[in-house]
Amino acid sequence: MRRAIFPGTFDPFTIGHYSVVQRTLTFMDEVVIGIGINENKNTYFPIEKRVEMIRKFYKDEPRIKVESYDCLTIDFARQVDAQFIVRGIRTVKDFEYEETIADINRKLAGIETILLFTEPELTCVSSTIVRELLGYNKDISMFIPKGMEM
């Protein structure tokens, strides 16, 4: 079974994240959405809420699991028996950062990272922008997957 983790903070989960998951399902048997707990980040939604929102959204998709983790991503990948890490790339800056991390992960754990480039119409979508809009009580429905409850 080909299993990948898709790690992130997902604060909140956006249509960009959704796109990466859907595209990953075309070449993986299972995707584990790993929601990292990072004590250095101030999040809008608590970890429990993010896990709940994403699990509820994917409740009818048996090939998707949702878990939180508070260790190195490569250790989480081992815990869930994933052979791959999938990351979404929006910009050249994202690529340069992810390429470095992918090299380190390969050297430390022998795990491969698959970089998926964002569809052009989604490059402006980020959790940061969505959080800012939420802070101003703006409608965010165009930036989150249809059917996702906040």
UniProtKB/Swiss-Prot annotation:
Its cofactor is Mg(2+). GO terms for biological process: coenzyme A biosynthetic process. Keywords: ATP-binding, Coenzyme A biosynthesis, Cytoplasm, Magnesium, Nucleotide-binding, Nucleotidyltransferase, Transferase. It is an enzyme of class 2 (transferase). Gene3D superfamilies: HUPs (3.40.50.620). It is found in: Cytoplasm. Its EC number is 2.7.7.3. It catalyses: (R)-4'-phosphopantetheine + ATP + H(+) = 3'-dephospho-CoA + diphosphate. It comes from the Bacteria. GO terms for cellular component: cytoplasm. Pathway: Cofactor biosynthesis; coenzyme A biosynthesis; CoA from (R)-pantothenate: step 4/5. InterPro entries: Cyt_trans-like, PPAT, Rossmann-like_a/b/a_fold. ATP binds at residues 9-10, 17, 88-90, 98, 122-128. GO terms for molecular function: ATP binding; pantetheine-phosphate adenylyltransferase activity. PANTHER family: PHOSPHOPANTETHEINE ADENYLYLTRANSFERASE. NCBIfam families: coaD_prev_kdtB, cyt_tran_rel. Homohexamer. HAMAP family: PPAT_bact. Belongs to the bacterial CoaD family. Reversibly transfers an adenylyl group from ATP to 4'-phosphopantetheine, yielding dephospho-CoA (dPCoA) and pyrophosphate. This is Phosphopantetheine adenylyltransferase. It comes from Bacteroides fragilis (strain ATCC 25285 / DSM 2151 / CCUG 4856 / JCM 11019 / LMG 10263 / NCTC 9343 / Onslow / VPI 2553 / EN-2). The lineage of its organism: Bacteria, Pseudomonadati, Bacteroidota, Bacteroidia, Bacteroidales. The gene is coaD.
